[in-house]
Amino acid sequence: MDVVNKGIQKALILWLSGIRLENLRALPEVESLMQDGVMVELDPSPITGPQAQYYQILSGRLPAHFGFFDTLLPLCRLPHPQQGISGYTIVEESAGRDAPPEMLPDLLRNAGWTVEHEEISSAELLNCMQGLTQVETTLATCKIVKCTVGAEFIARTTTIPDALRMARSWVGQTGLLAVLSDIQPAPVKRFVNINNFLAEMGVIERDEQSHLIKWPNTLAYYAGHGQLWINLLGRDPQGAVHPQDEYEEVCDTLVKALPTKLRDPETGAQVIERVYRKEELYSNEYLFCAPDLIVVFKPGYLPSPQSTRLGLYEQTFTVPTAGETAMAGAHPSMVSGFLLAVAPTLASGVSLLDHAPLTSAVPTLLHALNVEYVNMDSPAVSALFSPAYLETHPIRTDAQGQELSEEDEELVIGRLRDLGYI
C-alpha cells in the first residue's frame, strides 16, 4: 500500500515541555528516531516565556495576532484596568485581547481527524501512554500527550524510553511519531535590572527619601520579560513624554544607548543584543497595545525578578545561585524547542543545522499528515520532507497574507490617533 499517496492514518505527538535536546540524545530510542527521521530546533520570537511559546508551538501563530505579548503587564495596559490602583502596578495576565486562534487539535478535528489531547504530569506519562496505545482504530487518529519534564527525570527513570517504544509500536511503519518541545531552561550568568540603569541615566526619576518612582518626571520604564514602555502623555496615567517628536527622540535614545552603555561590570561585555521598535516585530491590528520597545538580552543574561515587576534595587546586576536556570525573558536561542519526527512523508536521517521558527512546528506536522492549513506565520520546513512527497505535495509558501486590509489599516490608524501617536 502506498502510504504517501493514501495518507497517514495514525499520529502520536509526545510533547515534552522544558526538556533539553542534549539530554534526550543520550537515549538509544531517541538516537534511533533521529537516524530514521528528522530533527530541527525551533526558536521562539521575542518576548520569550512559557505561555508565549505554548501559543506559538500549538497554533503556528505569533500571540501578538490576538493581542498577547507577555504574562506581566502594567495595569494601565489592560483593556479594563481596575480603579483605585496605580496604573503602573504590574499584574499577571495570561490571555490576549482577543480569543486565541485555533490550536493543532482543532485544526486536525476540522480536517476529519479524531484527536485525543492530554496534558499530564511526568508521573502520569507511562500510564497515559499505555492507555492511549492499547486502543486500535480504523479512523484517522492523532494522540497528543504533553507533560513537563527535566534532566533529572530522564536520568533517574526509564519512562521516556518506555513511552517512545510504545509510541513507535502503535504508529508502526505507516504512521507519524513526533517528539516536540516548546521551551527549555536557560542557564543564567547574571540577572539584570534595567530599571536601575534607567534611573542612573535619568530616564527614571526617584524620590530621594522614599525612593519611589516620580512618574510625572519619568520618561520610560521596563516591565515583564522584555517590555520597554515610554511614559506617554495622554496614554499613560502620569505621562511625561509628548507624542510624535519627543516620543521618537526617547525611543531613538534607548534603542541606541541600551545595547552600548549597559555592560557587565566584571567583563565589560554587552548584555543587551538589541532593542526593537514595536513596528519591527509586529504589524497587526493589536500594534497599538504592544510595548513601545522590545529588549532582547544577550545569551546568559535575563531580567531580574524584581525588574519584571518594576522593582528598583541597589544592584543593577545580581549573581544567580549555582546552576540556576530561567525561561521567561531569555534570548530566543537559549530557550528554543525542537521537533523530532519520523513518518513515511518525511526524510530519513536529516538533522538541520539552521534553526526554524517555533511557529513552523504546526504547519510542518499538518503538511506531513496532508492536512491543508492557512493563516500560519511560517510555512512547513521543506528540508524535513522526502523529495517524493514534496513532488506531489508542494508546500504552501503563502502561509498567510502579510498585508493588512484597508479596513484593518483604518482601525489601527484610528487607535494610534486616539492614543496620540499620530
Task: Provide a role label for each language-model segment.
Residues 7-9, 25-27, 31, 36-55, ...:
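Secreted, luminal/periplasmic, and some membrane-associated catalytic domains
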Residues 9, 355, 366, 378-422:
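Long, internal low-complexity/basic segments
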Residues 10-17:
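Short, hydrophobic/glycine-enriched beta-strand segments
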Residues 18-21, 47-48, 62-64, 121, ...:
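Short, solvent-exposed loop/turn segments at secondary-structure junctions
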Residues 40-61, 119, 148, 187, ...:
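Short, solvent-exposed turn/loop segments enriched in Gly/Ser/Thr/Pro and often Arg
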Residues 123-163, 225, 233-237, 241-242:
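Active-site His/acidic residue clusters
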Residues 228, 295, 338-342, 365-369, ...:
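A short aromatic-rich beta-strand->coil structural motif
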Residues 301-362, 367-370:
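Low-complexity, glycine/alanine/valine/leucine- and proline-rich hydrophobic stretches
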